Amino acid sequence: MLNLSAEQRPRLRQPIVAVLGHVDHGKTTLLDKIRGTVVALKEPGQITQHIGASLVPTDVIEKVTEPLKKIIPTVKLELPGLLFIDTPGHEIFSNLRRRGGAVADLAILVVDLNEGFQPQTYEAVEILKQRRVPFVVAANKIDRIPGWRSYPDQPFLISYRKQSEEVRERLDNKIYEIMGELAKLGFDSERFDRITNFTRQIAIVPISAKTGEGIPELLAVLAGLAQRYMKGRLKYVEGPAKGVIMEVKEEPGYGSTIDTIIYDGIIRQGDTIVVGGIEGPIVTKVRALLVPAPLTEMRATKRFEPVEEVSAAAGVKIVAPGLEKAVAGAPVYVVDSPEKLEELKEQVKREVEEVMIETDKEGVIVKADTLGTLEALVQFLKNRGIPVRMARVGPVTKRDIVEAMTVKSKNKEYGVILAFNVKVLPEAKELAEKEGIKIFQHNVIYRLIEEFEEWLKALREEEKRKVLETLVRPGKIRILPGFVFRRSDPAIVGVEVLGGVIKPKYPLMKEDGSRVGSILQIQDKGQSVPEARAGQQVAISIKGRVMVGRHIHEGDVLYTDVPAEHAKLWLTKFKNELSDDEKFVLQEIIKIKRKQNPLYGVVLPSPSS
């Protein structure tokens, strides 16, 4: 709301609405359609322009939803309208942050009916959950349902009634699929016209952003929800403005500016403001408040026009000195008295520091382009049990590589850098390559985490494989009568593997637990083999002070001599790596060993448990 006198100001502000969803599911088309509707139904001079947002005024909502009055009861609107954030997607949504939640009051989750839930849909739902933002599902592209006949700009319910039984069934099945996906994520949902309680169920509105079908219901559901359940949150506040930076931009003739969404109160030209910056709070004075020049402006060169004041909810460009280090996703507060300045500086500092993590613990290094995306990324990692040592805004620097090296020296798994939508500085890249520090870079959060998790899984498998190769596996063999090829130095005998596994270098013991050398080589049909398993008959050479006929005899049963520490690992960390017959042989080995050492293979509880 821009430049309104006190009498003109309504009692409620417009709800701020964000649009999220998977790539190519129709977010931008939907916003374009909504904007186009406003332009078509308003006199050009009456359109209030915002920076980074589009206002759909109440009179436009009423005109669009007029045909619905014949079908469903509609609410008398007290809201001044709906303020849509122009840039869709969860990167911008992440920046619409405030302490303990989001600046957005409502969200539209756009889902392509024909494709259903996709990776970024799940990511969007997770962010909406994190920020506790109520949302409506726009089930888009109904015009793509085979056999659908389009009725441009009509309410969905009118179009739906004109479709064949078969087409309606196809649509309903697609909606049930979306309901199923939402149920898996813990949400009860239903088609909007079948909902009895909007606080308990998520409304699914079938639409076509292309033809405009269903847009009347979508606007009606959003406005109705906001008015019915959010009046407390939307109360108009006269006090000093609170806002959030969506983008920091260099503008010719103005220098560094911040595109800001004001969600509370009023901001005026000349006000002192405190802004969140990378290096701490920035205190500055508003030189100008800019909004886009009206579309009717004759001189096309004039992109912005100044206004004296702006009140919530609004999108505005703030021009002020010293904004170069301001960071998107950080708060903007108007200082209404000198006494409040220190308090607000402290508040801004706290808010930024809550997101910019710096600890000594082992964990990954996270870099992102804005405070909002950093916060979302850290939350995603925490939800997946991945610890974070440091989280900062900005490019990957040499210092980040040094931090990762410190972590890597203690824990290979987390000595890495996750970089979202930021560059890696040349000297950082050089050091990372030299020190073998892995940098994951992506501009889609879920892909960034996915790539890291895939790498981590492969690393853990490789580490596990290396450890497993050093462990002696349980094995049991019998010396075959009549198959003694050499009695000693080394003894060579034919054996049958009765259970488990034998490999070269494995020590052997008798049934009384006494050691009888170790396996030098295994041969099957004259060929050396790396191992032999249960059921195989092979020739083995045994090195050590062992002679067939004196220390061991034909028909003897021998076991692999599993060291006590190895037995503990087989019983705990690697128990799922043993086959059933190996587990059985291990129990026999434990029984033999405990006659000599009662604590063999005993797993003692750790002090912390």
Swiss-Prot record:
One of its GO terms (cellular component) is cytoplasm. GTP binds at residues 21-28, 86-90, 140-143. Keywords: GTP-binding, Initiation factor, Nucleotide-binding, Protein biosynthesis. Residues 12-230 form the tr-type G domain. Residues 140-143 are annotated as: G4. It comes from the Archaea. Residues 46-50 are annotated as: G2. Belongs to the TRAFAC class translation factor GTPase superfamily. Classic translation factor GTPase family. IF-2 subfamily. This is Probable translation initiation factor IF-2. It comes from Ignicoccus hospitalis (strain KIN4/I / DSM 18386 / JCM 14125).
